[in-house]
C-alpha cells in the first residue's frame, strides 16, 4: 500500500509539473490547440487500459442549428435488441480539451457494466468556443434523446435516460440534472467542478497542485467563463437552491483534488433535500484518475460501481 501511495504522488507531481510548464506557454495558436488534444490522447494511451469490446459502436452527428454534434453510441454485448436504457456521458478536460476518444475506456466500462447503451458527446471546446457553447451542445443531445429522436434508429428509450460526466462534464451533467429533473433517471458525477467563483478549497495544501492545480482552474476561468457571470447555475450548479426531486446521484471526490470540498458539499446539499445519494471519496487518488486505469486499478473499478448504481435506478431492459 505504501509503495502504491508513493507512486500515486510521484505520478501526480510529474503530471502537475508538466501541466504548469505547458500552461505558462500556451497562447492558443492553432498548432498549440492541436498539441493539447494530442498530448492528452498520448497520456491516455500510455496510462489507461483498453475498455471491454462492444457488440456495436456507431459514430454519428446529432443535428442542431448551430453545430452538428458528434456522438458515439456504445452498444455492449449484453444490451437488449429492443430500445432500452441509455446513459449519456459528457467527458472532462477543463472545457478546453478531452474528447470521445480520451474517455473511451470509461464509457466502455460503464456500458459493459450496465448492459445499457452509452452515448458519449463531443461538445464544443474553449477557447474557440467559450461558454455557453459546451453546455448548449450537451443539452441539445439530451433533448434529442428525451424527445425520442434516437429511439427507432439507435434504440435509445426516451423514457429511460440518465446522464453523467467527470470534472467539466460533471459540471454540465449536474446542471442538466437540475433542469431536466423530471425526465432524467439518475446522474453520475465523477470529481465534478461545481462552481466557478472561488477555485481555492477552504484548506488548500500542497496536494492541490497535483494533476489539477490552481493555475489550471484559473486557466478555465479565463478561457471558458470568459467574463460571464460565474454565479449562474449553468456555470455553478452548486448554487442552485432548489434540489428537491432531483434524480438519484452517484458522486465521487478525490483527496488529491482541489475540487474535493465542493463535490462533497453538493452531495450533502442533495441529501439534505431528500435526493438519494451514493457518495464515494478516494482519499489517495488525484483528479482525473479514471483516465489512468493502468496506473490506478480503481480507475477500472469505479466505473463498474457507477454502473451498479445506474442499474439500481433505471428501468430493467425488456427481454
Q: What residue ranges belong to the model's regions?
A:
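A glycine/proline-hinged amphipathic helix-loop "lid/cap" segment
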Residues: 1-76, 315-319
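Short beta-strand element of the alpha/beta-hydrolase
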Residues: 83-92
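Short amphipathic alpha-helix adjacent to the substrate-entry channel of hydrolases
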Residues: 101-120
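Gly/Ser-rich "nucleophile elbow"/oxyanion-hole loop immediately N-terminal to the catalytic nucleophile
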Residues: 146-162
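Gly/Ala-rich beta-loop-alpha elbow adjacent to hydrolase catalytic centers
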Residues: 165, 169, 173
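Hydrolase active-site cap/lid region
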Residues: 178-228
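Short beta-strand/loop motif that positions the catalytic acidic residue
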Residues: 251-253
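Catalytic active-site module of serine/aspartate enzymes centered on a nucleophile-bearing elbow/loop
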Residues: 296-319
Amino acid at each position: 500500500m505504501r509503495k502504491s501511495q508513493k507512486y500515486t504522488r510521484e505520478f501526480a507531481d510529474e503530471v502537475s509539473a508538466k501541466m504548469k510548464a505547458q500552461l505558462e506557454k500556451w497562447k492558443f495558436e492553432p498548432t498549440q490547440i492541436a498539441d493539447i488534444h494530442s498530448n492528452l490522447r498520448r497520456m491516455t494511451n500510455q496510462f489507461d487500459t483498453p475498455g471491454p469490446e462492444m457488440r456495436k459502436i456507431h459514430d454519428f452527428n446529432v443535428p442542431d442549428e448551430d453545430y452538428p454534434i458528434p456522438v458515439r453510441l456504445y452498444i455492449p454485448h449484453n444490451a437488449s435488441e429492443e430500445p432500452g436504457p441509455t446513459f449519456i456521458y459528457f467527458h472532462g478536460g477543463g472545457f478546453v480539451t478531452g474528447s470521445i476518444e480520451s474517455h473511451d475506456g470509461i464509457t466502455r466500462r460503464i456500458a459493459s457494466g450496465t448492459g445499457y447503451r452509452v452515448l458519449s458527446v463531443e461538445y464544443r471546446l474553449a477557447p474557440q468556443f467559450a461558454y455557453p457553447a459546451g453546455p448548449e451542445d450537451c443539452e441539445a443531445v439530451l433533448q434529442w434523446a428525451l424527445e425520442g429522436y434516437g429511439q427507432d434508429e439507435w434504440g435509445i428509450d426516451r423514457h429511460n435516460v440518465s446522464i453523467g460526466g467527470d470534472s467539466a462534464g460533471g459540471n454540465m451533467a449536474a446542471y442538466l440534472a437540475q433542469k431536466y429533473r423530471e425526465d432524467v433517471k439518475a446522474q453520475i458525477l465523477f470529481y465534478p467542478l461545481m462552481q466557478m467563483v472561488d477555485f481555492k478549497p477552504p484548506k488548500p495544501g500542497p496536494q492541490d497542485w497535483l494533476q489539477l492545480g490552481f493555475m489550471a482552474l484559473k486557466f478555465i476561468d479565463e478561457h471558458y467563463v470568459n467574463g460571464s457571470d460565474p454565479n449562474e447555475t449553468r456555470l455553478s450548479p452548486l448554487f442552485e437552491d432548489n434540489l428537491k426531486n432531483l434524480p438519484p446521484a452517484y458522486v465521487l471526490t478525490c483527496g488529491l483534488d482541489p475540487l474535493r470540498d465542493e463535490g462533497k458539499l453538493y452531495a450533502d446539499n442533495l441529501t439534505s433535500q431528500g435526493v438519494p445519494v451514493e457518495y464515494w471519496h478516494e482519499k489517495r487518488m488525484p483528479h482525473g484518475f479514471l483516465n489512468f486505469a493502468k496506473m490506478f486499478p480503481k480507475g477500472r473499478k469505479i466505473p463498474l460501481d457507477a454502473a451498479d448504481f445506474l442499474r439500481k435506478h433505471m428501468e430493467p431492459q425488456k427481454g
